[in-house]
Amino acid sequence: MADTQAAAAETNGAAHDLGNGRKHILINAFDMSTVGHLSPGQWKNPKDKSATKRKLKYWTDLAQLLERGGINALFLADTYGGYDTYENSLDECIRRAAQWPITDPTIPISAMAAVTKNLTFAITASTSFEPPFLLAKRFSTLDHLTDGRIGWNIVTSWKKSAFKAIGLDNPIEHDERYRQADEYLRAVYKLWEGSWADDALNPDPENDSYIDPDKVRTINHQGKYFTLHTKHIVDPSPQRTPFLFQAGTSSAGSSFASTHAEAIFVSSHSPQVLAPKIANIRRLAAEQGRDPRSIKIFATFTPIVGRTDDEARAKHAELRSYASVIGGLVLFSGWTGIDISRIPLDQEITAADSLEAHKVRSILDSFTTTTTDIPRWTPRIVAEAAAIGGLGPVSVGSPQTVADELERWVREADLDGFNIGYVTTPGSFEDLVELLIPELRKRGVYPELPAEDAEPVTAREKVYGKGQSGLRADHVGSTYKYDVYKEDPPYVSEETVAVEEAPAEVK
């Protein structure tokens, strides 16, 4: 979004101060199994090959590139329906290839894992559309096949088109979605953490016994939204619970994140807008007995890097010539619930313009919060910003210029890392690996590549350190571990409680 061109600073190879005891910036590559992702229109660019995402080779080539650069993870966004707020129609979403069409991000993961050793994978999956048992089985399988290199980006779905696709007329109300998601997480913790003892799988050929059934607990979950009476069908994987990402900084989203997330994905045009939201999440986590620094915060960031500032500016100008302004407005309208086609070009946009309260409140807030950099949001300004980089900042410059900007965001917003978006693929991620990462390493703020003979680690160990494959002891999921497991009491509705507590003559 915001186009920043910070002045380059001298670098002498000494480690830079990132604040709050941080030593390294964590970087994920941010992609989506679709043609456009955050920069619609680049399919017209002859250098862009994003249409080849339908071929497995795209994904294996990308994974090997990211592995070569020592990137922490490939973070894959997903969506379950098209964007139909703009002009109250899906037509422009389809016409402009604004995250349409889109394939399932889960399918290529095992192929990418087979050609890498250290890269981890974070997949977006919703708590709104499938039973906890099915999701738990899929992620346990992926955790096995990747040797523990899997993460789950938890989302609560909000698009009307997605709910209609599964036979529901309207999305679940915003805060209700998070209450449902909280129960969903507790249900999958029970399956992942509480169903199998560590030594349940103990092959004993002499007695024709592969698994001890007495050490596989039946989960009997009776909640408001979900009911499970089952043993988990997959044996414990290297992490048991995948590394947990979550996106959203609304009041309900922040409360959910401070309880469940190990990493949070945020987005804004300004670090000053993010800083109080991040501080609030860390405060809420501390109130629950969690180490607030254990929650890692990643912001969207799209760098356009050249060997010099002038080269980067020339790249940016070329990329803008292919950008789809309408495609960007389609995404903006879908994310915020504001049909921007109804608003005059230079009229200020406010939250009151959103006609759909179920949309992503944190995104709506980001796009309607002003700063000194962007004192007012109008359709004209949105049109300039949204077509390249989508939600987050766009930094244009040499490796030194962009590295300065990354460091500034880390310090001013209290970030731990970034989800780095692309504009063209190939192109953007090659520049990340070949130009930007070496500069960050030169500054001492990005880890060196592991030794060839180093033992691979899990997704969670890459963040928390070797030996921490499972959930931390201060995470709520640890209360469901096999050895300490206690089944939650069945859900009882408020109406039932009121009737049971009413005097006999009232009953």
Residue ranges and their predicted role:
Residues A2-K507:
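N-terminal glycine-rich cofactor-binding segment that shapes the pocket for flavin-like pterin cofactors
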